[in-house]
Amino acid sequence: LIKTIDPKKNIFLFELTSKRKIVLISIKNTIKTSEVENLGAEFYGRIKNEKNNEYFLVSDSLDAKHINFLGPFLHGLKLKSYEFKKYKSKKNDKVISINIVGSKNKPSLQNQLKFKALEQGTFYARDLVSEPGNVLHPDEYAKRINSLKKLGLKINIFDEKKLKKLGMNT
């Protein structure tokens, strides 16, 4: 049985049994990095509600044109997986494992570190904007941003006097 998940994205599901499925992703010859990230996000959207929680990506099946496919694909998947769970009483603790099988076309350690830094920054920003206003007031926001100094970020926090002096009319 073949079920087309989304023919525009070229993601197809083959059901072998109720517990075993194969997901095929067809890639265009020329594909932009943002499209690859969107495919990763689309893939996560499809698998997040499945009973199965372990998936295998075969990296050897990628041709030379798509040598840098897996890094952005996994990055898009990771960004899509974000959930703000801080105030939820029932937390979804499901862990989805993505295993890369094969010896070719794996993302380099440098790429993995770059994407991890982007994901951490994105998730931090998403956490901040998801906090309610009665929790993340200006003083608390300044405190949280100030904690980024340890990462080497230069931070200037202005009080009301400094803002008036700069002509910001607060």
Residue ranges and their predicted role:
Residues 1-170:
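Short amphipathic alpha-helical segment within the helicase RecA-like ATPase core
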